[in-house]
Amino acid sequence: EVNNIMILGGSRIGVRIATELQDEANVKLVEYNPDKAYKLTETLEKTLIISDDGRNIDSMIEEGLSNMDAFVAVTGRSETNILAAMVAKRLGVKKVIAEVENLNFINLAESMGIDTIINKKLITASNIFRFTMNTDVQAIKCLTGCDAEVLEFIAKPNSPATKGQIRELDFPHD
C-alpha cells in the first residue's frame, strides 16, 4: 500500500501525479525553483510543496525520503532523475519511478534497479500504435538510427483512419 509519496520535479508530469494522488495519499513535491514552488502551492492545496535541491542527499533525507512508500523523479534531466531514484532505492523506498527521456540511458537506469522508467516518446508511440492497431492496420515499418523513431502505418481500405482528416479521428486526449 502506498501512503507516502515524494515527487521530485514540478514538471507537468509531477503536477499531474500530485493532483491525482493528493486526495488518497500524503504527497510531497520537491521543486528546485522557488518561484515555481510558490506557484505550485496555489494549485496543489493538499500536497506539501518543498523548495529545495533534490540532488542534495542530506536535504532529501531531512525531508523524509527514507520514510516514503514511493518516489517519482520527473525533473527535466534524465541524469538527475536516475541518480535521485538510485538514492531513494538505497534508502529503502519500495517503489521508485524515474522519467528518462535520454533513450541512451534507459538500459542503464533499468540495470540500476529502478522499478519503473517513464519515457514520453515511447509512451506516445505505444499509445499511437495501440490506437492504430484498433483501426485494422495492414503493415508497419520502423525507421531508427536518429533522435526520432518513425512508424509508417498502411491502413486497410474502409478503416476509420481512411474516412476523414486526422483531426477528426477519435484520438485519446491524454
PLM region descriptions:
Residues E1-D174:
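Cytosolic regulatory regions of ion transport systems
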